[in-house]
């Protein structure tokens, strides 16, 4: 089967569609597998769910705000241990957890010692994705670093468990070019493709709308993926608005394998 999930227009639930063919997703019936909370966390702005199969279980990573702090967007995790995520039962694992420092080191802040690392998921965080490479699993997400100006960067970390990071965040990409800074300085919506000896990460840039476009990062498959120097960024968008082709504001893609075995 092909499985499909996406932001629901009412921002209040997560649904899954299932089809034997990729074209069949369009008209496939959808099943609601989770609904937002009435109060507290996970109560508003249910955004950008992604479905992943990890170590024999299914997981959905999504972003959500609180009922009274709707823009306190953070990543959360759902888990399904059944074979079919469309038919199976889903459970909340709660928020995605940052790496916990094992002990206090000289010069380390009290905040870092008493809790999780003081950087990951402390501000507006969303659009999480995950991938495995050579026995290690990685987590990539978008997070704002300046509360007032709101620069959205991409970060990467190794994972300890499906709902917890093993390392502190590493800056993967920040809006460097003019085409990443239209109306808002944004890098978000990462998607990963392993192909031809490379690790590719596509991402979305600028404000949503006609100016929304897509950039691309790449690293050699033998590189240390937590080393920022291992990654290179294309200087120009790989997809952008093209009225002649009736393409407007492309962004936040995914990759899959088509019915004919080709990468889509």
Regions found by a protein language model. Give the residues of each.
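Carbohydrate-active catalytic/glycan-binding domains of CAZyme proteins
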Residues: 1-264
């Amino acid at each position: 089967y092909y499985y499909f999930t996406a932001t629901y227009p009412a921002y209040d639930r997560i649904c899954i569609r299932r089809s034997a063919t990729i074209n069949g997703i369009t008209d496939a019936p959808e099943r609601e597998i989770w609904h937002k909370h009435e109060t507290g966390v996970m109560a508003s702005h249910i955004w950008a769910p992604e479905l992943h199969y990890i170590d024999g279980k299914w997981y959905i990573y999504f972003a959500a705000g609180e009922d009274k702090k709707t823009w306190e967007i953070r990543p959360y995790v759902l888990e399904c241990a059944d074979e079919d995520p469309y038919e199976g039962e889903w459970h909340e694992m709660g928020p995605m957890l940052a790496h916990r420092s094992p002990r206090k080191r000289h010069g380390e802040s009290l905040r870092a010692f008493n809790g999780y690392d003081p950087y990951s998921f402390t501000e507006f965080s969303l659009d999480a994705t995950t991938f495995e490479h050579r026995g290690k699993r990685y987590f990539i997400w978008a997070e704002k670093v300046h509360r007032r100006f709101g620069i959205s960067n991409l970060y990467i970390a190794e994972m300890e468990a499906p709902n917890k990071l093993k390392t502190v965040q590493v800056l993967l990409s920040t809006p460097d070019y003019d085409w990443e800074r239209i109306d808002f300085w944004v890098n978000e919506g990462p998607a990963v493709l392993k192909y031809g000896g490379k690790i590719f990460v596509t991402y979305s840039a600028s404000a949503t709308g006609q100016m929304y476009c897509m950039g691309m990062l790449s690293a050699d498959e033998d590189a240390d993926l937590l080393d920022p120097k291992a990654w290179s960024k294309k200087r120009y968008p790989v997809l952008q608005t093209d009225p002649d082709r009736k393409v407007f504001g492309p962004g936040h893609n995914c990759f899959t394998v088509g019915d004919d075995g080709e990468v889509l």
